[in-house]
């Protein structure tokens, strides 16, 4: 058998696999493999075709899947093509070099590209006749799509009529669903694997009233046979007709700028409300697009630079249980290492007992793991086709694995809790970790490893111990420097960080207590409402002492109020707070309707202040709206001087920076009502 004959056999098998997965993905909206695995199959096929070009005559390019027979077929006036993929910077560079060569461009000629988000949704086309929506269809196999006209009409903000449009107009775009709406949809009893499947399944409903309930969104990206000169002009025209287009779009003739846009959107994708899986580069000049034309599958003038995979398949070796600071028992998947998006994943969240039962997850299974942005990796599905032997169902523990206490499940909750409370060392350690975290007391140098060390030696067993640590070390005559990892500098830095943390704003203080349902956002709302620690504490006591008493604050719901009431009903919590505040200076919050004379200014301190510590002065200044810097520059607005100012004083004079005494600064930070 020749190499080419062998390659043809491999190609036939690859084509069969790809067609099978196309059917599942495009028509049935129930893929069995991840996008990365599918892309790998297509990549293997392209390598063979590149090595044996004559095999192209045996290979028919398919796009998507055949239309769903439940819907009437629609023949596309212009084929709806898919895009070639790039998987690294070099692939993009090759594409840009190739297009310049095909266009016979000189080295000094610029070629502008439109850089757009590749939204992970379902492609669709709409035809307008005489300004009225006439017909909408899916991509289907590129030649024929499914008629989804009535369903598309239910999408919010999609124009049914257009002013000043040509008699015949075809526009194309993407239907998608926001991640939060997808989560809500599944919480209501649906079982979609991901937002893309949810959008595709929703637009293919036989009953348009169901589609209307699904909160679908859309984004238009092209006008078929446009008279516009550029892609940028096309997008502007779509906007003028009332269509939604994507705001995250740039045009550039600079390769590095195009790559920087990719990197920026990749790093920022978790802050976008919908899923994106890459960047599309299109030649901006539409005349040049026509010159380049298309292959049987894709345009020669565009390419999709895919993001690294956020999903992958690996073996679940073991399910372990993690006990958090609120006592919640969280199941964790211990995985065979897998590289997802450049990060090696060995553990992932399984959420709760109900999720394990619903997905029928068992130790030894092969599972789909998803990682999105900074979100904790999670197991989203199980590949049961690889469960070749009978695996035992997972039994959730009836006792806390950390302390042995009984566990319980509250009514109407999926979480299971340890009843050990302060007896459970896992809860204590997690509570302390939360207390010292960045958005709470922000004590640098007290990480998980250090806390465990101090806990085991009985130096920090509760949060009060943090502020008496130096005293305990001295009383017990413990030489920290004799332990591995504890040098004189690290000890001094830690004790200094603890001392500096004793000045804290009200918002961070409330958050540090770890009260259930009181996250950073709610803590800020409470601080801004009550302004001072005294006001807040007094109201919390009223809440605890009178079951009929309540607080009316926008965005603070009954669940949060009941949690605050429960927390302040416990005497040990009151004792802890009262002991804690003896070590602290809690800075009042400033009402949102107040500003100060240093609001928005950059300030620097030098010398020793007589009225407070430097850390307290920094916090007061930041509370008043100033940015506090450690070094002078031409952007510094004020230098505040105390006793024995350093060299910054002379430098400020040479830079003509305004100098304030401590007394004047104290006046400047007072709130002025606006």
Curated annotation (Swiss-Prot):
SUPFAM superfamilies: BRCT domain, DNA ligase/mRNA capping enzyme, catalytic domain, Nucleic acid-binding proteins, RuvA domain 2-like. NAD(+) binds at residues 35-39, 82-83, 116, 139, 174, 282, 306. It holds the Pfam family BRCT. It catalyses: NAD(+) + (deoxyribonucleotide)n-3'-hydroxyl + 5'-phospho-(deoxyribonucleotide)m = (deoxyribonucleotide)n+m + AMP + beta-nicotinamide D-nucleotide. GO terms for molecular function: DNA ligase (NAD+) activity; metal ion binding. It is an enzyme of class 6 (ligase). The keyword S-adenosyl-L-methionine does not apply. Its EC number is 6.5.1.2. Residues 593-674 form the BRCT domain. Zn(2+) binds at residues 400, 403, 418, 424. Its cofactor is Mg(2+); Mn(2+). GO terms for cellular component: cytosol. It comes from the Bacteria. The active site is at residue 118. Keywords: DNA damage, DNA repair, DNA replication, Ligase, Magnesium, Manganese, Metal-binding, NAD, Zinc. Belongs to the NAD-dependent DNA ligase family. LigA subfamily. NCBIfam families: dnlj, PRK07956.1. DNA ligase that catalyzes the formation of phosphodiester linkages between 5'-phosphoryl and 3'-hydroxyl groups in double-stranded DNA using NAD as a coenzyme and as the energy source for the reaction. It is essential for DNA replication and repair of damaged DNA. This is DNA ligase. It comes from Ehrlichia ruminantium (strain Gardel). The lineage of its organism: Bacteria, Pseudomonadati, Pseudomonadota, Alphaproteobacteria, Rickettsiales. The gene is ligA.
